[in-house]
Amino acid sequence: MKRLLISTTSLAALALSATAPSLALQESEMDMAASADESMDMVEEAIASNPLLVEWTGPYGGVPNFDAASLDDLEAAVEAGMAAHLEEIDAIANNPEPPTFENTIVAMERAGDPLGRVFSFWGIWSSNMSSPEFRELQRELSPRISAYNSQITQNEALFNRIRTVYESDEMETLRPDQQRVVQLTYDGFARNGATLEGEAAERYAAINLRLSELHTRFANNVLNDEEAYVTYITEDQLSGLSDSVISAYASAASERDREGEYAITNTRSSMDPFLTFSDERDLREQVWRTYYNRGDNGDEFDNNALIAEILQLRNERVGLLGYDNYAQWRLENRMAGTPERAMDLMEAVWPAAVARVEEEVAEMQALADERGDDITIAPWDYRYYMEKIRLARYDLDSEEVMQYLQLDNLTDAMFYVAGELFSFEFTPIEDGVVPVWHEDVHVWEVTNRETGDHIGLWYLDPFSRTGKRSGAWASSFRSHTTYDGQEHPLSTNNSNFVEPAPGEPVLISWDDANTFFHEFGHALHTLSSNVAYPTLNGGVRDYTEFQSQLLERWLFTPPVIENYFVHVETGEPMPDELVERIQAAATFNQGFATTEYLASALVDMYYHTTDPTDIDPDAFERETLERLGMPDELPMRHRSPHFGHIFSGEGYSAGYYGYMWADVLTSDAAEAFAEAPGGFYDEEVA
């Protein structure tokens, strides 16, 4: 808002000065000052009254007022929040005092709180509660947000102050964590166009603006296909499916006003059990194609053209900074350091993974032939026949295991682990005390179980629904800081479990249980943070998966098995012989899991190290996989047209390798626990 008003008054001043220089100059300066004051009054009024901007109040250090949130307030909130932040930035940049850590770096850490609150609501509307109305607002606002960001990163006076602090003698007097904040702040500007001038700076900003539009469209196109493509089946097509899966599919159909039918929604949690258990091969193929063709249906929501433009713009942008390719720029400040080091790790594992897939396919084909099924193993057969082999070889039925994996019990198991490792205690908060964005969401207070001190809040949004993006993820509304008084974290976990019929328990697969623990690891990272400054929360991308992958190891520890793996009907604990069968099958199907992941990670890196001029993403994906020797019997975990990790934003672009990089760290850490006297619950190692 403020930027638009200033631009208008500047043009008016120029017009006046052309006719009456002296008088116009005086009047225009007065007009500009009055207009600026008026605009800031409007901004301050919005911050005080707009539900998306107001300070969070209530218990637990203040919480987001989701019960008062309305899309009607979003545009005004974003505009006012950006204007307020730019006013703060201008004050920092034009401070007449010499630049110091306190008046420049800490001042920047402190700035922008109202807009940060708005983006907490934005994140929920984007990922958990999307709608056509929000997507239209998102389309309109994303370019403005990009322009606002460029206005900050290309503020020459601001960057000069940051650089002065970075190069000053004061750096030697700062604590290590303060030095790290300065380093990250400087890099955040220098690596994002602050050193550019003239046409190069203008082009850099224009590229970022266009990328913001493309990233938004990519994500919304995938979400559209997840909502629009639902496979409905009838009672005579349920062969092979368990009662719990059938019940979940019936509930999903009922929610869509298709009573008497069964809905396989276009999400992994819904697709996976169908491909694993359904005897209907034609339907397995239909469900498989529906899922893996998200964003690739040749219609207005097709993402291939967007991918090409995204890659071209990213490459051009880093070229302005002097880099050979996007991956070189991206990995420069990551643990891997260079694309070559990341590629070396992945390519070292790839041949063994593919060889294992070939063995798995041979076993499946032999089983199919023995059964007289008269088929050649195809991608929609992989899960189905591997499940048959698992049952034959290990006497292990995934459906049998699911009877011991109730969502509520697994949640309690995670709380137990967090208590043993971090001394955290999770206490459910009565519904209605803390506002939530959907009735499915529940909140727990996290305290130190020894001292009783408040740590933060944990929100859980467990179920799939229309408007919620697929997959599982962790996020936060507030991170821990102490530089300006202690702030307590507000952390969230989000899943897409299929909601059962009312009164029915939520049973989940072993893979989903593993993912549940994985994402809780991210939440624990947020809750256990102990840093002074906001910039220090998180970590480099190829490290951030370490803590989440490590927590997966606690899913199958004895205390969790003995106390939380209980049968849904009998309440009996999982028998030892079933535990032994699960242990025996621990590495079963690893060819599939490793190869589908690595294919995505390798294609990501090849995309971002290749000249993207005239690139055809569909052909590039196909030719790259062929060159790698990708088995025909399985796809990438994320095909390019729905690879949101790398194309709906830049968080994981040229960075999907990070899961494998972190797995190396995870193996070392897990070994340290395993060798400790107290095992995975050893206090000293924890």
Name each model-derived stretch:
Residues 406, 497-517:
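Short pre-active-site segment immediately N-terminal to the catalytic Zn-binding motif
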